């Protein structure tokens, strides 16, 4: 069996994205998938499928760290997964029935990806204001309403992530901050990262079964991104986080508009 080919350009892209993820905490999907589609000309379905398994590997590392710190609320993680995993399976079935590699499906994935990037940029820009608003005016819904709102949030994320690999990070955290204003932000982030592991793994394996995963590309990306995340995390204490987030949000707006109008 031949060894997979390592592409240096993919590894350098992974390093760049990994550093940004470590610096800002923004999920790699919102960065890596557009790079693969727009810069490398990768088919949208292959870019999404490969990035999902890439995300599963990186999120698993983050889950281990948060688990050791005790900053995961497994109740929230379970509620999200109860909605997202079935929604991911249904979305993959829908993509399969419509033809994963047809021009129409490629255009639809690209359009939804652009919309997801625009939503992610809004979540990044307005998260501080939403967090402050939630702290001043905490919602006090019934336990049942909170439960089903969380499951519904998971279902929406399941559809978005399965189609675009984007949404589990910035969008998920922002909604959880509104649903659980009394919970520490670190526990919300940890719970969201832990939820992303089964979601991206199920969605990624589904894409693999449908033939839209490039394993050589995946390995090349991971070889660059894993050390990049470590480096970015080490530099994060010295980096101007607010400036980086605003620049990143502006970039996502530009890329999102480009994908929607393409």
Region annotations inferred by a language model:
Residues 1-13, 38, 65-163, 206-209, ...:
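Juxtamembrane transmembrane-helix boundary motif
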Residues 34, 51, 92-93, 174, ...:
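Transmembrane alpha-helix boundary and packing residues in multipass membrane permease domains
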Residues 18-19, 35, 39, 63-64, ...:
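Alpha-helical transmembrane segments of multipass membrane proteins
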């Amino acid at each position: 069996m031949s060894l997979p080919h390592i592409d240096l350009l993919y590894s350098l892209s992974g390093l760049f994205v990994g550093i940004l993820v470590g610096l800002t905490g923004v999920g790699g999907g919102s960065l890596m998938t557009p790079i693969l589609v727009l810069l490398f000309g990768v088919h949208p379905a292959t870019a999404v499928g490969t990035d999902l398994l890439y995300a599963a590997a990186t999120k698993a590392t983050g889950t281990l760290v948060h688990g050791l710190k005790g900053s995961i609320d497994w109740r929230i993680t379970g509620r999200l997964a109860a909605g997202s995993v079935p929604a991911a399976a249904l979305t993959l079935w829908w993509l399969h029935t419509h033809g994963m590699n047809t021009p129409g499906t490629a255009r639809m994935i690209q359009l939804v990806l652009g919309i997801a990037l625009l939503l992610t940029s809004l979540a990044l820009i307005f998260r501080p204001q939403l967090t402050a608003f939630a702290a001043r005016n905490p919602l006090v819904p019934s336990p049942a309403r909170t439960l089903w709102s969380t499951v519904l949030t998971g279902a929406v994320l399941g559809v978005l992530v399965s189609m675009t690999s984007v949404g589990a990070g910035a969008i998920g955290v922002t909604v959880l901050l509104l649903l659980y204003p009394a919970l520490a932000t670190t526990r919300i982030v940890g719970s969201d990262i832990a939820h992303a592991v089964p979601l991206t793994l199920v969605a990624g394996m589904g894409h693999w079964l449908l033939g839209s995963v490039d394993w050589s590309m995946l390995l090349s990306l991971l070889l660059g991104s894993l050390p990049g995340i470590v480096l970015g995390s080490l530099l994060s204490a010295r980096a101007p986080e607010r400036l980086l987030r605003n620049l990143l949000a502006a970039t996502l707006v530009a890329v999102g508009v480009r994908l929607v109008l393409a």
